[in-house]
Amino acid sequence: MQLIKGQKKQNRRAKAMNINTALAAATCALLGAPAIADNSDEGWQIDTALLYYGESDRVTALEAVVAATKDFGDEHIFSGKLIIDSLTGASASGAIAQPSVQTFTRPSGKGQYIIAPGDTPLDDTFKDTRIQFEAQWTQPLREDLRGSTGIHLSNEYDYLSLAINGSLAQDFKQKNTTLSVGLSYAYDTIDPEGGRPVSFAEMVIDRGQFATEAAYEAAFYATRQQGSDDKTTIDLLLGLTQIINRRMLMQFNYGYSRSDGYHTDPFKVLSVLNNQGLSQALLHENRPDQRSKHNFYWQTKYAMDNGVADLSYRFSTDDWEIDSHTIDSRLRFNLPNASYIQPHFRYYQQSAAEFYQPFLRDSDSMPQYASADYRVGEMSAYTLGLKYGMTLDNGDELAFRLEYYQQDPKNPGFSEPGVLQDLQLYPSVKAIIAQVSYSF
């Protein structure tokens, strides 16, 4: 997952920014386009960042980003970005905590891991490296009309994503109003080590019942599908950006997304419990093979005498019955000596997918779809942080960001039989985010 957002494209050589310039830069940020340099002779603008993300006893991520933008004249702009990130640590398997020791087979089928009584089952060998490349070209097509097209490539150990995009932006009323439309197509393939699990197949665990290693491997691979699977995604975006006055800018977006293909997480399982809440088996999850989402987004930027206020709200709904609300706010205060501070607060809340179940009951019939992944369950989350940036004597910009993130899964209404009532089934996920960025 991308942990670093693209840096705002601003003219780093400016020692001060008046209100009109601030609104112009904000317009570019809202449209997702690079800001236009005052003079194409200034050459390339480079943004770099290094980010650390660390969860308590879970995932740790390091991410490096290099982004480059160049105006070749007459607003013919190229922008590119290279992202490399590495993730290690422990990832939740979806199984439920138990009052006794639990044994799990690793997703590859090679080896096992043990979970202590009362602990959330985590696979502590989670490790992955991702390389992502993006390129975008933007240019005027005629007066007040701009076109943009781009490509996206992301590669992990077992996952490949390719995407293309295109968009148009039309200005009206002396560029005070902009209408935009964008379309993208993505093709993803997944080929996990050990194969893709058969839906609701029971996890094969070697407890000494197999006479030979070959017998175990035969049982394991009987629950697997060999070869890769894929998913396609089409995204449509409609946008309206309006300059309200010399201080205020507002944007409205509507987005539609349709994905078809393999949506199941091959690394997630569900616990099957008896009436006492004790685990009887572990089954691999199964999700629907298509998903449609609608997104509604509003953002306002207000240029103050000594800074910029930024507030946004997003509502998302899909046919998995996941509804989410996101409020994001940033308040930048300009300080003496060409520096600034920017507090940040973000709140997120979502409902559970219709097929989300924290566990299955052995007395119930098997559902068509089910997942115990907390990421499709009911939850709330918040981020609280602070960024400090400064413009150096040579016009370059250096910034530091430190944030605290907490995610709180919730029980969406399932009864907890027997021993589960004495266990922590929905632990919070807490993380620290630290970033340093340098632009020149």
What are these regions (language model features)?
Residues 60-64, 127-133, 160-164, 230-236, ...:
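Residues that define the transmembrane beta-barrel architecture of outer-membrane proteins
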Residues 57-59, 79, 89-93, 158-162, ...:
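Outer-membrane beta-barrel proteins
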Residues 388, 396, 427-440:
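Outer-membrane beta-barrel "beta-signal"
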Residues 70-72, 139, 170-172, 242, ...:
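Residue-level signature of outer-membrane beta-barrel architecture
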Residues 46-48, 80-82, 149, 179-183, ...:
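Membrane-embedded beta-strand positions of outer-membrane beta-barrel proteins
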Residues 73-75, 142-144, 173-175, 245-247, ...:
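Outer-membrane beta-barrel channels and translocator barrels
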Residues 50-54, 84-88, 151-157, 170-172, ...:
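Transmembrane beta-strands of outer-membrane beta-barrel pores
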Residues 81-133, 178-247, 344-391, 416-418, ...:
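Outer-membrane beta-barrel translocator/channel fold
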